[in-house]
Amino acid sequence: MSDDQSPSPSGEPTAMDLVRRTLEEARAAARAQGKDAGRGRAAAPTPRRVAGQRRSWSGPGPDARDPQPLGRLARDLARKRGWSAQVAEGTVLGNWTAVVGHQIADHAVPTGLRDGVLSVSAESTAWATQLRMMQAQLLAKIAAAVGNGVVTSLKITGPAAPSWRKGPRHIAGRGPRDTYG
C-alpha cells in the first residue's frame, strides 16, 4: 500500500488515514506560525541571552557566596520573620549573668518577662532592697545588651516565706513575722 491510495473499499477513511491527515494539518499550522514542523520549535532558534554577569570564580576577597557565620544567619532569619522581640526577651532571661554581671546574677534570678516588665527574685530582702536602689543602672545595662524598649520596668521581689501549713485542716496562726528575708 502506498500513501497515495484512497480510503478503504467501503468508502470511509481508515484510522491510519485519519492520523496522517491530522498530522499534516498540525504540520501546516506549525509552518504557518513559523515553527519547524518536525520538532515544534521556532524555525530559526535565537541564542539564549544570559541575564546578569557572566559566571566568575571567587577571588581572594570576601564574596556573597562564601559561607556565612551561623550567628549572623540566625539573626537575619529572626529579623526577617519578625522574631526580634522574642529573641531579645530570651536573651535577657538566658544570658542573665552576661547582661547584669556575675555579682548581681549570684544573688538575683529573673523569673519572667511580660509586657516589658521583668520580674526578678532576689535571694534576700537586703538584696531586693539593693536591687531596687540600682533599678536605673540595671535597666541601662539591659538596654545596652538587648536594645531599648525590651524591658521597661523591673519588679523586684525578695524570697518567698515558707508555708507553715501542715495538712488539710488549718487554723490561722500568727503569720511568718519578720523571721525570714
Swiss-Prot record:
Residues 1-11 have a biased composition (Polar residues). Disulfide bonds: none annotated. Residues 40-50 have a biased composition (Low complexity). Transmembrane segments: none annotated. Residues 18-39 have a biased composition (Basic and acidic residues). InterPro entries: DciA-like (IPR007922), UPF0232_actinobac (IPR023007). It holds the Pfam family DciA. Residues 1-70, 161-181 are annotated as: Disordered. Belongs to the UPF0232 family. HAMAP family: UPF0232 (MF_00630). PANTHER family: UPF0232 PROTEIN SCO3875 (PTHR36456:SF1). This is UPF0232 protein MAP_0004. It comes from Mycolicibacterium paratuberculosis (strain ATCC BAA-968 / K-10).
